[in-house]
Amino acid sequence: MALLQIAEPGQSAAPHQHKRAVGIDLGTTNSLVAAVRSGQADTLCDEQGRDLLPSVVHYQADTIRVGVDAKREAALDPHNTIVSAKRMMGKALADIDTRQQPYQFVAADNGMPQLQTRQGLVNPVQVSAEILKKLAERGAAALGGDLDGVVITVPAYFDDAQRQGTKDAARLAGLHVLRLLNEPTAAAIAYGLDSGQEGVIAVYDLGGGTFDISILRLHRGVFEVMATGGDSALGGDDFDHLLADWLKEQAGLTGELDARLQRELLDVAAAVKHGLTDADAVPCTFAGWQGSVTRSQFDELIQPLVKRTLLACRRALRDAGLEQEEVLEVVMVGGSTRVPLVRELVGEFFQRPPLTSIDPDKVVAIGAAIQADILVGNKPDAEMLLLDVIPLSLGLETMGGLAEKVIPRNTTIPVARAQEFTTFKDGQTAMAIHVVQGERELVADCRSLARFTLTGIPPMVAGAAHIRVTFQVDADGLLSVSAMEKSSGVQAEIQVKPSYGLGEDDILNMLSASIANAQQDMDARMLAEQQVEADRVVESLNAALAADGEALLSPAERAELDAAIAHLLTMRSTGTTNQIKEAIEAADAASGEFAARRMDASIRKVLTGQNVNKV
């Protein structure tokens, strides 16, 4: 649906005024901007007719160059020429492989990577902002005025920190972000709406630095992402590095190359890769070595990486509950899908030739432009619904270190879910909320996202307060968590922005661990639940004994109940799940008469001095 804008009376825009909106594919290697003009979405070109903008920024003493001009400086001035900044978005310096990069890295106080340039320290958000500025200038020039809004695409596996970094870059560039859109979903818009295709579609997106696989179901204009997978650190750049290492070996070079020679080597490798798209062999010259690279040699180098992408495809299909033969179409996205081996192996895996009718470099930007045109209000009658999913379950910690899932993984977003919790102790006036992410049963095995405290809870007996905790994930995949005590209305809220991003390996490890430890985790959860119940029973009995034990129990009865409590505490520390359960039942039985006497005493106290006829 269109995003509605409210204005003061007499200041609203003309009802049918066409607004300027663009879609931006902010890529690792190249970026594009597209717009809908005369009802047709297409990419926008610069003065030289080029639509691809290299995602490269060169910092000179007094100016900043972006794109082709910056890329020319990469080999000459690598320390001040930043490429593939998207790989570093939302990550800590410790999480970045700096070995093959020519930059001088400096860690900020918050762990964010900074790069030393002639203009001082810059971070990936600032670098990305320069690219977005350049694309926005192109869009404004093509559309004849300032932009009213943009849709920016991100890999489906970008986590909260990476998405927030992208939004921050857009804000630095002075752009109004209508929505962050998953790249595979954007491709589905470009293909699905144009062809009217209904059914299951696999979107295979292999760009310069990231790989995403999305399993989509298209039905009556509704896009549902059934499952996602991929690798946020795998793409055509890795093909270049493998080929560069091979060329270095052929040239007889050993040890680390200086920054300029390393950049030249990567440029040669990229040129050879592009040449092998159409040729069986490509001549090559580097550092005095002359030879050629055949397609079969290149295929042998990259085949393990391509097969890695197919493993992710298999996992995504399993998550969606589908087999390969149920996929009707396979959409190829990203310049790296031009590699013949990629198309061949993907076709074999899905048992059908992949779709390549739309330029794989342009398809994401075109889909983003279509979505931007709708969100800005140029197509108010459009009936298109996008349903993305979250990759890992979101929940919070409960007593005993248990992880209570509030939003399960692969839930479509935007989404809001709420659960009610209560206090554990009498008179409890605060509750600590610990937000976690993951599939395991115990908090210790999940990823901690954020903590906050709800204070001002009215003192009540344990279990009387009702605290409603709401998890809300917006259309950009960002999470906010709020907690409210229902009787008083006191509340607290936090927006979850994880300090650092999760890599694909981390996500896969978390999923694999949840499967491998499923039975062990469930056993641990059942044990923890019984331990929590034992604590509750002991707390309740001790409070009751302190209040009425001396008045209502004989010494022998008190000794018997004390023994039952002591046995329960022993079992709680050393016993099995069943032994703790039996000890709880024994304590309940031992305290049954005491509970009945307390009830009688309470009733007598209430009725004292009352007229029987009025009761």
From Swiss-Prot:
PROSITE patterns: HSP70_1 (PS00297), HSP70_2 (PS00329), HSP70_3 (PS01036). One of its GO terms (molecular function) is ATP hydrolysis activity. InterPro entries: ATPase_NBD (IPR043129), Heat_shock_70_CS (IPR018181), HscA_NBD (IPR042039), HSP70_C_sf (IPR029048), HSP70_peptide-bd_sf (IPR029047), Hsp_70_fam (IPR013126), ISC_FeS_clus_asmbl_HscA (IPR010236). The keyword Chloroplast does not apply. CDD domains: ASKHA_NBD_HSP70_HscA. GO terms for biological process: iron-sulfur cluster assembly. It holds the Pfam family HSP70. Keywords: ATP-binding, Chaperone, Nucleotide-binding. Belongs to the heat shock protein 70 family. Chaperone involved in the maturation of iron-sulfur cluster-containing proteins. Has a low intrinsic ATPase activity which is markedly stimulated by HscB. This is Chaperone protein HscA homolog. It comes from Aeromonas hydrophila subsp. hydrophila (strain ATCC 7966 / DSM 30187 / BCRC 13018 / CCUG 14551 / JCM 1027 / KCTC 2358 / NCIMB 9240 / NCTC 8049). The lineage of its organism: Bacteria, Pseudomonadati, Pseudomonadota, Gammaproteobacteria, Aeromonadales.
